[in-house]
Amino acid sequence: MTVPDARKDLLVVNMGPHHPSMHGVLRLIVTLDGEDVIDCEPILGYLHRGMEKIAENRTIIQYLPYVTRWDYLATMFTEAITVNAPEELGNIQVPKRASYIRVIMLELSRIASHLLWLGPFMADIGAQTPFFYIFRERELLYDLFEAATGMRMMHNYFRIGGVAADLPHGWIDKCLDFCDYFLTGVVEYQKLITRNPIFLERVEGVGFIGGEEAINWGLSGPMLRASGIQWDLRKVDRYECYDEFDWEVQWQKEGDSLARYLVRIGEMTESIKIIQQALEGIPGGPYENLEFRRFAGTKDSELNDFEYRFISKKPSPSFELSKQELYVRVEAPKGELGIFLIGDNSVFPWRWKIRPPGFINLQILPQLVKRMKLADIMTILGSIDIIMGEVDR
């Protein structure tokens, strides 16, 4: 038996799982030939918390605080998809005012997510300055969230049939002021970054994905639109009231890391356009919160009442999920966030399958980094934009 010659000069290194550039607890086993990447294997699961199984033992209103822990930088989208599923299952109509408020919150959340992508991405490729700049705008955004929802992150704001509370007095003017200020901030980022020769050297032509290849891998969001595919669920599905606003799908045809950066920068400007139109055209009427009305209709248990002893054993009043199945999706900052829901004539879902965009976008990483340099791994991984909370669930 002849033993094949083993190459002695290949080096296997671990990147992560607790490295600042890993964007969470991601571990990469990288095989190197000098500086060239021969192979890369992502190791997942360090942040797995059984989110799908938890959903099967909770009513929707009980489960809402959990979903903000998937993508903890864009929590409004996880809340939106969680209430959209039972709304479609039960044919629940959302009032126009509540729909406008949802769109405003979703787009503010998209900007917050893209900002917190931009800073670490620039830090990954060696530019520290934008990392500190993004926190100015992010702080203003979180002030708006706190005023409207009571929380800076993990907002728990969306409800079946509407939102938890109406916008407070003066909030709309404050938000319009932020929009005007933020547009100047985006111009500043573009001056600082977009034509910077060192930045272009690091990202141009790095991590190329063609349009057909992107579709075959099931990519979505900026990863797909940067490869020349004009696919945005806000235009395709027309959920909430996006079709009432004038805005453009941001896309590029180059398919490299620079194109993905340009798509996200453009999306922030488009989000501001949507928010301004929604704020100026927001109608009156109810913001609706069906769960609150359901709670208000229940009898308060007396201290010595028979029911009081069993109050912790009873599920909170909620909607029965009819015995059918459906798939709902929204255009999250990272791509298509979907829920496959199976009802069983119970207040608990029979199956709650999460389709996270980060998990599917991450699958192409080993192919993108092959035959690239070691330093390009951080550029490519950063341009994909993953959050391990939603990857591992």
From Swiss-Prot:
InterPro entries: NADH_Q_OxRdtase_suD, NADH_UbQ_OxRdtase_49kDa_CS, NDH1_su_D/H, NiFe-Hase_large. It comes from Nuphar advena. Its main location: plastid. It is found in: Plastid, Chloroplast thylakoid membrane. It catalyses: a plastoquinone + NADH + (n+1) H(+)(in) = a plastoquinol + NAD(+) + n H(+)(out); a plastoquinone + NADPH + (n+1) H(+)(in) = a plastoquinol + NADP(+) + n H(+)(out). One of its GO terms (cellular component) is chloroplast thylakoid membrane. Disulfide bonds: none annotated. Keywords: Chloroplast, Membrane, NAD, NADP, Plastid, Plastoquinone, Quinone, Thylakoid, Translocase, Transport. This is NAD(P)H-quinone oxidoreductase subunit H, chloroplastic. One of its GO terms (biological process) is photosynthesis, light reaction.
